[in-house]
């Protein structure tokens, strides 16, 4: 029975890796999977060695504070790899953790497939040297990444975005509004503060202020879909008298039926783009992390939507710009409709076209992994 180590450090990676595992089970039904898991990987039958919730930390300074715990999980995962001797490892996202894991696995002669490329094109470009040495195949989910990494000698393949063709609502707008007792005549705003508790806690105060300001100007429905990694109670404890309705999951339904999303920069903005939902993006880290990042990051935009488009399609309110006043101003402008909203929707449609033009990413990833296991490493077309 072949064993495969699978590791995902955050919610999006947990989803992407679980889709690949499901495809692998179809072509390798006798394979056994173990590793660092979130709820989706566990649901896909991957045996847990480390819980990915213990790795969900963002920001340079924030990571430093959690190094002892993260190092303990790192050692636990590598100990399992030594004992179980997997034929291959699939590492997903979370590069600060997984590139170190890749280095150790390379020494154990375990082939490493890396799913979701580290953003070396944006910062810390020196990481490509380590990747070239330790990674057997890099599976890229954005169209511009393959060329960048191949230029540096990393064996990269663009497989398409795992969410392309997958993101869609389960309920109609009428069903969603009825289920959550929303006023049918009011616009719907989704609040998406991030899938990690640390980042969500930093964003909540400004978002609460923004919603209060919006509510004073326009009657709206507001929902906050809580991810499995944060939980409903985490947000309910922080809502006070806010009109925000916290719901469990259902983020795709919420975004699909929203007139606007207030979205933390990350995977959720790609999901909103695939659903065609206008949005205002934001993000905030600690002051020290922000200053350090300003010296290290070399990209024109922070939002992946704008990076894919190659232009400013959605507003970006980063760090000190992320205030309730600024969020509310941008939100009200877009809720009013008109030219700005239509131009954004046209830009989002172009982003969707770029991503949705290559569906079936999990299947292509599974075939690439199968080829490596069979010793037939070829370019996946």
From Swiss-Prot:
The parts of the chain that form a coiled coil are none
Swiss-Prot/TrEMBL catalytic activity: a lipid X + a UDP-2-N,3-O-bis[(3R)-3-hydroxyacyl]-alpha-D-glucosamine = a lipid A disaccharide + UDP + H(+)
Q: Name one GO cellular component term.
A: membrane
Q: Which domain of life is it from?
A: Bacteria
Which pathway does the record list? Bacterial outer membrane biogenesis; LPS lipid A biosynthesis
GO molecular function, a single term: phospholipid binding
Classification via Gene3D superfamilies: Glycogen Phosphorylase B
- Write down the top EC class of this protein: transferase
**What Enzyme Commission number(s) apply to this enzyme?**
2.4.1.182
According to its UniProt entry, one GO biological process term is: lipid A biosynthetic process
Keyword annotations of the record? Glycosyltransferase, Lipid A biosynthesis, Lipid biosynthesis, Lipid metabolism, Transferase
Query: Function of this protein?
Result: Condensation of UDP-2,3-diacylglucosamine and 2,3-diacylglucosamine-1-phosphate to form lipid A disaccharide, a precursor of lipid A, a phosphorylated glycolipid that anchors the lipopolysaccharide to the outer membrane of the cell.
Q: Describe the family membership recorded for this protein in Swiss-Prot or TrEMBL.
A: Belongs to the LpxB family.
Query: This protein is called what?
Result: Lipid-A-disaccharide synthase
What is the primary gene name for this protein?
A: lpxB
């Amino acid at each position: 029975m072949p064993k495969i180590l699978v590791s995902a450090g955050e919610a999006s990676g947990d989803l992407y890796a679980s889709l690949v595992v499901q495809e692998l089970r179809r072509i390798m039904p006798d394979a056994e999977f173990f590793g660092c898991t979130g709820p989706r990987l566990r649901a896909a039958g991957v045996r847990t060695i480390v819980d990915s919730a213990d790795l969900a930390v963002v920001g340079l300074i924030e990571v430093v504070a959690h190094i002892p715990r993260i190092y303990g999980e790192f050692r636990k995962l590598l100990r399992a790899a030594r004992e179980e001797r997997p034929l291959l490892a699939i590492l997903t996202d979370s590069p600060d953790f997984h590139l170190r894991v890749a280095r150790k696995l390379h020494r154990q002669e375990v082939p490493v497939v890396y799913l979701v490329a580290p953003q070396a094109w944006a910062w810390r470009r020196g990481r490509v040297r380590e990747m070239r040495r330790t990674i057997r195949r890099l599976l890229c989910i954005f169209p511009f990444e393959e060329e960048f990494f191949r230029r540096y000698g990393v064996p990269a393949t663009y497989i398409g975005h795992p969410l392309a063709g997958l993101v869609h609502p389960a309920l109609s707008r009428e069903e969603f509004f009825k289920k959550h007792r929303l006023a049918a005549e009011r616009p719907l705003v989704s609040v998406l503060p991030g899938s990690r508790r640390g980042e969500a806690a930093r964003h909540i105060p400004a978002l609460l202020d923004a919603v209060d300001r919006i509510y004073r100007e326009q009657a709206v429905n507001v929902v906050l879909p809580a991810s499995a990694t944060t939980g409903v109670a985490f947000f309910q404890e922080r809502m006070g008298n806010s009109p925000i309705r916290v719901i469990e999951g259902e983020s795709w339904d919420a975004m699909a039926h929203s007139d606007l999303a207030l979205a933390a920069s990350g995977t959720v903005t790609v999901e909103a783009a695939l659903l065609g939902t206008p949005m205002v993006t934001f993000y905030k880290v600690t002051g020290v992390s922000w200053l350090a990042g300003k010296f290290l990051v070399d990209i024109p935009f922070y939002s992946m939507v704008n990076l894919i488009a190659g232009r400013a399609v959605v507003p970006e309110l980063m760090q000190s710009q992320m205030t309730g006043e600024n969020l509310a101003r941008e939100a009200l402008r877009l809720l009013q409709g008109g030219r700005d909203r239509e131009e954004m929707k046209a830009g989002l449609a172009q982003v969707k076209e770029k991503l949705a033009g290559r569906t079936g990413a999990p299947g292509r990833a599974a075939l690439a992994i199968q080829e490596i296991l069979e010793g037939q490493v070829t370019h996946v077309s």
